[in-house]
């Protein structure tokens, strides 16, 4: 378009004689061109065209085209191009003086845009050309005016500031006028600039001019740059107390959504939530991060002190914080009156402090990685899904915000320290101050310190502390699996259960059933474990143990270790059956909060032999240990029909183990249904409280949700015909059921615990012979807690076969095995009741049920799996 010329320049199309006689192809663009031959004296109006296109316009047209298209383009189609319409100036110089070239080009385009081949592209190009030329002219005009104003000397009587403001006002006035009073064709604000390097955008120009016009004011030296510009929390800058010292402290600062809003906690003593979950973590967000911003907040909290690791008092708290800021927070403050045992200054343990300067990981680095210094503080398992942003705090006195922004749970009121050592550790129960509702932690995986101290002080100190601390919250959870939380925090533990002292400072967990009782073997070394405490102190201390890391089916990142003996039996993966000292504590815990184990683990709690790691026999060292535990449990339980109250340790189930049948050494009465009081049922079940139910009552409760009425009770249990052998022995089996019901009320004479222990050692080899064993080998066996070896086990020695005198107690309904040995018994025409009674031979004398003597489960676990389906069908 730069080659276009207007008027009578050199670029004018000069038609030949033939073109003058006949209209050419471009003559139709102007209605005046159609009468060129007739009105030769009229000046012809031709629009500009590039020189290279001038030859194309001189092409001749047919002679008759002038007559055919003479009246085609009339004035009605183009009213603005009438003969009397004003025409432009022929000279390009005169037109450029009056109007810029770009404006003239736009006017030319607006007239001829209907005939252009690429209308939209040409429109865009002409607009850009016009905008560039107009902007360039305005800039040159402004520079000339600025030069002219700067050459004028200021008034000699004016001061320097007045002269500066006058020069700024004069220099800014033309630019402002050029920006505000713009041409009507200047739509540059809505157009992308053609060349960004040619001219700046109007917004940039205005902003730069506005800043240069003001007088620069020096900022205060103590005013940090982070106050002017918002800095993310992950940016490494020391935390400073700017809210009180800055002069704009009344302006509320902007709080990130991912951080704790302290203002909400300042106004409300208890942080408000929309709807906390039933067992969600409730950690009050009171930490040193809030105290750094507002140290006066500690006065609003009762029973709250600010003892630092250097022994600074509460009066020197302000000076201590300023000192910590000056020292780049290498000596942090310790809140909640933690007994740190002066380990912060221990030269042997350089990383004894809770927040170290050497921690060099960022929020983008996962805490589960093994390369950072926090690798030993976290379990190598994924984070649980029940984490809320308000449950964590970021401790600022760690030097930089990048190291403090990784969330950690606030263990309020806990005597805890962190160590950067490869040590597997167990935690004691946390004591939370009573100024806030008791809130427990549900961090099942990653954010748990792996190295914690025991509760300091004697039991009297703990009792006094509980007087103002309120009830204790639930204990920490294992990093390998989930453990339920206590719903009622006011009935968690009795205060006299806390017997830990400084002598037993490290309350690491005791051995379980997968470890040998070989004293104190410490996994990683580095700290000697005290081994000179007695059995009573260990049992009392370990009764409050929070979680174990040596379960058979749990996967830990660090190896477990063994300490003194503990009074509990580890079962399966996540369930723990403690002594009645834990069970007899007051408390109400519903079944829904019982355990986080799966349904199959609850169902097969400890009778399923497949859940055991090894077959428990008398040759394994675990058998003697379990028998010793069973002796302790026997002396504590009153009867198997009185189940314990809710297990107050979070690792303990809220019910005892599944009820077992008769085993060697039964000392208590038979299992009785708590609803219909029957003792003959093919399958024992449990209600939500853990009490035994018969199969009928349990199924009725499970299906209908209500207790089975006693009107539905019947003495007849219909049995399905599974095979032909069963149908042959129906009569004798019913007689044996009746005799079992009649005789099951009797009690066997109790034997000494030593005798039951001696008998328990022999059960895995072969059951001993009993008086009343049938010499015919009738294969009638009771439903034992674990599957017996074979039906011929009862024939090891002959016995008397006369009458009912030798019949032993059968606490459960006896099931007749359908084997070939039953056929000869059914050959007799009549099965008398006495004969039926004589066939009912239990496998062994009575033993305590599974809830009382857990050793019998593991002992009998290796005897085969002939009746394994009985315990696989345990439900509810």
From Swiss-Prot:
Keywords: Activator, DNA-binding, Metal-binding, Nitrate assimilation, Nucleus, Transcription, Transcription regulation, Zinc, Zinc-finger. It comes from the Eukaryota. One of its GO terms (molecular function) is sequence-specific DNA binding. Residues 1-65, 137-159, 192-248, 393-413, 451-498, 573-672, 724-856 are annotated as: Disordered. Residues 721-742 bind DNA. Interacts with nmrA. This is Nitrogen regulatory protein areA. The gene is areA.
């Amino acid at each position: 378009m730069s080659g276009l010329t207007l008027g009578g320049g050199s670029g004018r199309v000069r038609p030949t004689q033939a073109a003058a006689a006949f209209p050419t192809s471009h003559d139709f663009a102007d209605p005046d061109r159609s009468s060129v031959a007739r009105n030769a004296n009229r000046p012809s109006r031709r629009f500009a065209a590039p020189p290279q296109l001038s030859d194309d316009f001189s092409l001749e047209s047919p002679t008759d085209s002038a007559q055919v298209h003479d009246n085609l383009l009339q004035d009605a189609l183009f009213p603005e191009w009438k003969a009397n319409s004003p025409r432009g100036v022929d000279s390009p110089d005169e037109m450029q003086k009056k109007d810029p070239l770009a404006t003239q080009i736009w006017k030319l385009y607006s007239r001829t845009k209907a005939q252009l081949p690429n209308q939209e592209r040409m429109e865009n190009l002409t607009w850009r050309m016009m905008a560039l030329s107009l902007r360039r002219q305005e800039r040159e005009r402004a520079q000339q005016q600025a030069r002219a104003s700067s050459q004028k000397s200021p008034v000699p009587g004016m001061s320097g500031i007045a002269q500066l403001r006058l020069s700024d006002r004069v220099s800014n006035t033309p630019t402002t006028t050029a920006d505000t009073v713009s041409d009507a064709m200047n739509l540059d604000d809505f157009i992308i600039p053609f060349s960004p390097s040619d001219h700046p955008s109007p917004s940039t120009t205005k902003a730069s001019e506005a800043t240069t016009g003001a007088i620069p004011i020096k900022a205060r030296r103590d005013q940090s740059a982070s106050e002017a510009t918002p800095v993310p929390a992950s940016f490494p800058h020391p935390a400073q107390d700017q809210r009180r010292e800055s002069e704009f402290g009344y302006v509320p600062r902007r709080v990130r959504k991912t951080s704790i809003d302290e203002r909400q906690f300042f106004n409300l003593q208890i942080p408000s939530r929309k709807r906390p979950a039933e067992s969600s973590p409730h950690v009050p967000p009171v930490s040193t991060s809030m105290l750094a911003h507002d140290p006066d907040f500690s006065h609003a909290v009762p029973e709250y002190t600010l003892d630092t690791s250097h022994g600074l008092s509460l009066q020197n708290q302000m000076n201590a914080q300023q000192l910590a800021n000056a020292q780049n927070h290498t000596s942090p403050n310790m809140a909640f009156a933690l007994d740190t045992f002066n380990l912060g200054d221990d030269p042997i343990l350089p990383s004894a402090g809770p927040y170290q300067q050497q921690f060099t990981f960022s929020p983008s680095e996962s805490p589960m990685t093994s390369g950072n210094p926090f690798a030993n503080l976290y379990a190598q398992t994924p984070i649980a899904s029940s984490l809320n942003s308000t449950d964590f705090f970021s401790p600022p006195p760690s030097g930089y915000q990048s190291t403090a922004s990784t969330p950690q749970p606030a263990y309020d009121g806990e005597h805890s320290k962190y160590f950067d050592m490869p040590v597997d550790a167990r935690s004691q129960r946390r004591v939370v101050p009573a100024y806030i509702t008791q809130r427990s932690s549900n961090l099942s995986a990653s954010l748990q310190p792996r190295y914690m101290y025991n509760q300091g002080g004697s039991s009297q100190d703990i009792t006094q502390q509980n007087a103002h601390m309120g009830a204790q919250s639930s204990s920490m959870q294992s990093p390998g699996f989930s453990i339920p939380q206590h719903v009622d925090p006011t009935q968690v533990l009795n205060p006299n259960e806390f017997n830990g002292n400084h002598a037993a400072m490290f309350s690491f967990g005791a051995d379980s059933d997968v470890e040998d009782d070989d004293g104190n073997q410490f996994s990683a070394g580095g700290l000697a474990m005290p081994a000179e405490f007695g059995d009573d102190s260990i049992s009392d201390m370990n009764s409050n143990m929070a979680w174990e890391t040596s379960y058979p089916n749990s996967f830990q990142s660090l190896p477990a270790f063994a300490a003194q003996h503990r009074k509990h039996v580890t079962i399966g993966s996540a369930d723990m059956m403690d002594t009645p000292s834990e069970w007899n504590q007051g408390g109400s815990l519903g079944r829904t909060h019982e355990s986080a184990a799966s349904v199959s683990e609850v169902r097969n709690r400890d009778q399923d032999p497949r859940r055991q790691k090894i077959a428990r026999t008398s040759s394994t060292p675990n058998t003697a240990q379990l028998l010793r535990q069973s002796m302790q449990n026997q002396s504590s339980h009153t009867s198997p029909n009185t189940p314990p109250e809710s297990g107050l340790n979070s690792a303990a189930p809220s019910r005892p183990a599944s009820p077992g049948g008769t085993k060697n050494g039964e000392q208590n009465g038979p299992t009785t249904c708590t609803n219909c009081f029957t003792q003959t049922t093919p399958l024992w079940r449990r209600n939500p409280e853990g009490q035994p139910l018969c199969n009928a009552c349990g199924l009725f409760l499970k299906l209908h949700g209500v207790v089975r009425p006693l009107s539905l009770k019947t003495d007849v249990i219909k049995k399905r015909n599974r095979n032909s052998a069963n149908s042959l022995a129906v009569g004798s089996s019913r007689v044996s059921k009746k005799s079992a019901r009649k005789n099951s009320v009797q009690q066997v004479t109790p034997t000494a615990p030593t005798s039951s222990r001696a008998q328990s050692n022999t059960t895995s080899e072969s059951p001993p012979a009993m008086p009343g064993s049938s010499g015919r080998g009738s294969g009638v066996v009771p439903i034992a807690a674990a599957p017996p070896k074979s039906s011929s086990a009862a024939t090891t020695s002959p016995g008397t076969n006369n009458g009912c005198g030798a019949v032993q107690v059968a606490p459960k309904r006896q099931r007749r095995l359908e084997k070939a040995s039953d056929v000869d018994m059914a050959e007799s025409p009549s099965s008398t009741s006495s004969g039926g009674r004589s066939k009912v031979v239990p496998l062994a004398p009575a033993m305590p049920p599974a809830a009382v003597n857990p050793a019998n489960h593991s002992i009998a676990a290796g005897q085969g799996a002939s009746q394994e389906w009985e315990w696989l069908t345990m439900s509810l």
